């Protein structure tokens, strides 16, 4: 079962996780916990008069953060008693030292795997692309030192050389890469001359392209995320080489009952095409399989360039 309910409100509670499992999900990614959720602001109730000012200031500036995942750990412990599908925890931190501490607590709570939901917007003019990538590698290395469960990284699509970076992450110990993370995007309201943020929409074809280009070329699993609307989209991703397919927007729109429809659609397609398991057709249309028809990478590049020109000429 390749269908994973991705990190969202549907997976933030034991009841929500159980509903996903009952609906047929192969796994769930718990709603991400963010470091900012646990920042202590203002007065700590009934604490000021009993605590030393330095201790109180310590708590306000992050001292409690090391113990912040307590609620999500409790959710994991309770959910493990209710469902038998893998529970993938998701964390998003800003402070480098907190990634491994959060990860260790979540691992000890019984999570089956961990997804690092890394989001750093490169605003600094002095930060190079390699600096940006190195921050990811540092986080991964520190987390892997603390946990024994599989660790995946959910990547943004805006990486200069994704194949190279993907392999470096795999070499550093990433067990899987999730393509892609769809962040909030800015918009401008022209009448009020104000800015607002809108949720980024998953682009199925962008994920499909990079799944196909990376599958079986980098030494870790590849999973997709974003844009799934029907069972054909699931089949496409597996043909491209995806080991699992994350989705959530579809379930918001049509309900968790849509998971059964997706599974039935995939099974019907497999029956029609005489496949007995997803492994039988996984990656059949990946780049590495099609590359066999090319003499070298240069010839492959020429092929993709020719396809681009052929398609572009239709609109000329």
Model feature map: region roles:
Residues 8, 14-47, 70-88, 92-224, ...:
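Alpha/beta enzyme core
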Residues 10-11, 252:
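Short, glycine-/Ser/Thr-/acidic-enriched flexible segments
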Residues 44-62:
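Active-site gating loops and adjacent loop-to-helix segments of metal-dependent hydrolytic enzymes
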Residues 242, 249, 266-270:
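Short leucine-rich amphipathic alpha-helical surface patches
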Residues 246-250, 254:
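Helical hairpin unit composed of two closely spaced alpha helices linked by a short loop
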Residues 254-257, 261-273, 279-316:
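C-terminal extensions of enzymes
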